[in-house]
């Protein structure tokens, strides 16, 4: 990932000399992602996390890591999104996927710059099952009348019974389903290739984050709950 830390904030960036992350699979898409876990199979295998393409294979061997993989709790982010039409910023929670079926995703917040105006924005939130047969697709964009280019809080409450989504402490939606396994966090900024010679705005592109916090519910063991974020470019 490309990032800087200063003034008490994390600045997750897409920079001018940054190469596309996987040209054979995603063309010219660039991404910076901080994640709190890493799991993959042997070199050349198709075993890995958050599969983006059926042709994806393990190209580099890395040590598997669990830095912060909570199982239920509250996750909260305070951040500024971007109005850049070529970009998307997000905080996702995904299954660690040491078992393929443990692959569901909780999307805490996902914001495309093309959906941002000074008066309002569409904020994506919900659950994607992927290969988890116990979950069903329930994802939507909620239009909120705030300027997401300023700091706001995006929160998910994750219990055995439900997943609830909040913006600035206000409930947006609640789902009666819940992944029942540890999940890692994925903090991302994407720059999508555009049908024009130059990007919509000059690089670097920015996703400024004040904090990401996790709260453990009473009675839950502390194993796999402490650590710091891992970076992937």
Predicted stretch roles:
Residues 1-233:
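GH16 jelly-roll
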